[in-house]
Amino acid sequence: MSKYLEYPEVESKEQPPKKLVVLLHGVGSDGHDLIGLVPYIKNYLPNCHFISPHGIEAYDMMPYGRQWFSLQDRSPHIMAKLIANNISKVEDIIKQKQDELNLTNKDTIIIGFSQGTMIGLYLTLVQKEPFCCTIGFSGALIPPMEVNNKLTPICLIHGELDEVVGVSEMYNASNYLSKLHIEHSGHKLTSLAHSIDGRGLEIAINFINNRHCEQQ
């Protein structure tokens, strides 16, 4: 039995699954949040098994919710240290499900929102085996000390009206990825705040379906 909280998941329409989609929620939420997106996208991704793990820590600024790491101090070097300390626990959750489904990183798609994007991008950059692709909604990139993976394509999606994580963070992430020559795209969505809408989901679906993960 897993040492982490049991989380929601949705089986692929086609069996056995060929891909694993890992949904990483924002701070103060939990896995039940992003699993609610699956009914809107699963018909376009019929060979994908979806999991939405709960953050590995209790949210430390409210009596409910989960977090991937504390945001009480948002200094980049502090956040990087906290992520580095916790990233192996996130990897454990993913690896356990990969083993159950007989899949590997090259079959795995990471989708994050807000703090989930922060953990998802960091996770992607430190892998020794590339993920299929990574999508980040409304988040920021906290660079790791060492980048092991430059092969995973990354898609960044951000609302121009976001006042929680400003759209400037998308451009900061894009500049960082460009310097490392990592394939990526950025999409600024008009009239959207800190949220995911149908336009963003369509971009994500197209991005996933345009990947040829098995060739990586």
Swiss-Prot record:
- Look up the EC number in the record and give it: 3.1.-.-
User: SUPFAM superfamilies from the entry?
Assistant: alpha/beta-Hydrolases
**EC class of the enzyme, as a word:** hydrolase
Q: Which UniProt keywords apply?
A: Hydrolase
Q: Which GO terms describe its molecular function?
A: hydrolase activity
* Active site residues per record: S114 (charge relay system), D162 (charge relay system), H194 (charge relay system)
Record's InterPro entries? AB_hydrolase_fold (IPR029058), LYPA1-2/EST-like (IPR050565), PLipase/COase/thioEstase (IPR003140)
Which protein family is named in the record? Belongs to the AB hydrolase superfamily. AB hydrolase 2 family.
Record protein name field: Uncharacterized hydrolase RC1147
Tell me what organism the protein belongs to. Answer: Rickettsia conorii (strain ATCC VR-613 / Malish 7)
